[in-house]
Amino acid sequence: MAFRVLLLFSLTALLIFSAVSPSFAASSSDDVDDEDLSFLEDLKEDDVPGADSLSSSTGFDEFEGGEEEDPDMYNDDDDEEGDFSDLGNPDSDPLPTPEIDEKDVVVIKERNFTDVIENNQYVLVEFYAPWCGHCQSLAPEYAAAATELKEDGVVLAKIDATEENELAQEYRVQGFPTLLFFVDGEHKPYTGGRTKETIVTWVKKKIGPGVYNLTTLDDAEKVLTSGNKVVLGYLNSLVGVEHDQLNAASKAEDDVNFYQTVNPDVAKMFHLDPESKRPALVLVKKEEEKISHFDGEFVKSALVSFVSANKLALVSVFTRETAPEIFESAIKKQLLLFVTKNESEKVLTEFQEAAKSFKGKLIFVSVDLDNEDYGKPVAEYFGVSGNGPKLIGYTGNEDPKKYFFDGEIQSDKIKIFGEDFLNDKLKPFYKSDPIPEKNDEDVKIVVGDNFDEIVLDDSKDVLLEVYAPWCGHCQALEPMYNKLAKHLRSIDSLVITKMDGTTNEHPKAKAEGFPTILFFPAGNKTSEPITVDTDRTVVAFYKFLRKHATIPFKLEKPASTESPKTAESTPKVETTETKESPDSTTKSSQSDSKDEL
């Protein structure tokens, strides 16, 4: 304890001295720049522990492309909604491609891009990659939507972004698939679902009226048998205040079709009492709870709240098609039940009963653990293992968190868990590999359960690489990173570490891609870490650490620049008298690429 107090006192005095002595700090910076650092690159790779043991894994087979596996794994755009893409791992095995009739999907190349966009008022464009699993899953739905929307004068097109790089860069494609909707040459992001029905509904809302009139029984029958989610307003008049409120509400829901009628017989087909007081409204969907009646004030805000709360099934079954609907919903908290088919009957009944109390507040999701394509990979992502049903709460916002339920799957206990989840009374869960029994290599292994002990040790400056075993950029970085650690291993105040970001989590180690390299200065572990953005060389990293380390250090050039073979020949440490201000840091002009999550 006394040592920590003395250390913090010394660091405080040192920082104050540096702050009031800019010229002195500048001279220290010049000293770094003037150092002969060529010896740092002299260490041969053969002398670096682990240089010949790069991960043999070159693909993320459980999750095509690895992108699903960031905390926002079900979204599309890295800058807007996370990343529901396959960007970053083209080496993974592509899914088998079924026979798809794409006769109505226009193939766009750079040479015909302008013609397609300028000669058609409405164009939906998909940027894809041949190896992208999500693109392959989308293809049949996209093709079917193209055929249906052709009658409305809408063109659906696709662009192979791996061949048309300039187009992909021009439209800032950061993940696959990326869909853009062009109207008279102007584009905006597509934010709809991944099924034919949701694509068609989204596009029709953008090109037509928000509310359609239903005047005949034949038209009503077609709507009811379409399989789409439908809202029907039973109004006093097809124009006026009631219509205006319904139309305004329709603009807020891209995946629900809105209709209106004044015909009592049509209303009856939609399970509305023809003699009921107007305006009345009903939502019809194909799930188990098919009919939901509105009983509030007929104004936009109340209508939107009602539709948002009732359009999903009581319990949504997780599939690739339903993932966007679940995780891109305005409701950002979900309860996920992981269960096998043998366990599902009784458990799902309890789960559904609890769901009735949380409409519009929580989304209830069941995940089939027997499903090899998505059930088991999703369970692995969430850290679900072992036998028996598992229930977790998931907050799918910019700071995703997971909460594990510990108890018997009964509706009353699920309700208590759900209320505590809504009121932020639960402790989040973070994944962790087992703490290694031995951890004496130059690069220390960090896992979720020893993160605080190693990385958040206030007496140490700590460099952390968050990597993925399948990440090619991480594999390329490893020899240099090991070399850096070997050079710096005699500096007691500095720790070089790495953590597998696919199997370990910590709120202080948020990675938007792999590798992510973070620096945690001594004496300042409560602040956010510094993201290392510099050249991927030993010299560049050494300079970065010299500039940012709270506890100053300096390596002396060895008497001989031959590759050190023993611990005795490791460069000596020379402690300097001052530390440079972090404000003097300048970023390298060249940033290394990283594998997107």
Curated annotation (Swiss-Prot):
Residues 1-25 form the signal peptide. GO terms for molecular function: protein disulfide isomerase activity. Residues 560-573 have a biased composition (Polar residues). The record marks 194 as: Lowers pKa of C-terminal Cys of first active site. A motif (Prevents secretion from ER) lies at residues 594-597. Keywords: Cell wall, Disulfide bond, Endoplasmic reticulum, Glycoprotein, Golgi apparatus, Isomerase, Nucleus, Redox-active center, Repeat, Secreted, Signal, Vacuole. It is found in: Endoplasmic reticulum lumen; Golgi apparatus; Vacuole; Nucleus. The active site is at residues 132, 135, 471, 474. Disulfide bonds join 132-135, 471-474. It catalyses: Catalyzes the rearrangement of -S-S- bonds in proteins. Transmembrane segments: none annotated. Residues 37-101, 555-597 are annotated as: Disordered. The record marks 536 as: Lowers pKa of C-terminal Cys of second active site. Disruption phenotype: No visible phenotype, probably due to functional redundancy. Residues 37-49, 61-84 have a biased composition (Acidic residues). Gene3D superfamilies: Glutaredoxin. Glycans are attached at residues 112, 213, 342, 524. Its EC number is 5.3.4.1. InterPro entries: PDI_thioredoxin-like_dom, Prot_disulphide_isomerase, Thioredoxin-like_sf, Thioredoxin_CS, Thioredoxin_domain. Coiled coil: none annotated. Its main location: endoplasmic reticulum. It is an enzyme of class 5 (isomerase). Acts as a protein-folding catalyst that interacts with nascent polypeptides to catalyze the formation, isomerization, and reduction or oxidation of disulfide bonds. PANTHER family: PROTEIN DISULFIDE ISOMERASE (PTHR18929), PROTEIN DISULFIDE ISOMERASE-LIKE 1-4 (PTHR18929:SF246). Interacts with MEE8 and MED37A. This is Protein disulfide isomerase-like 1-4. It comes from Arabidopsis thaliana. The lineage of its organism: Eukaryota, Viridiplantae, Streptophyta, Embryophyta, Tracheophyta.
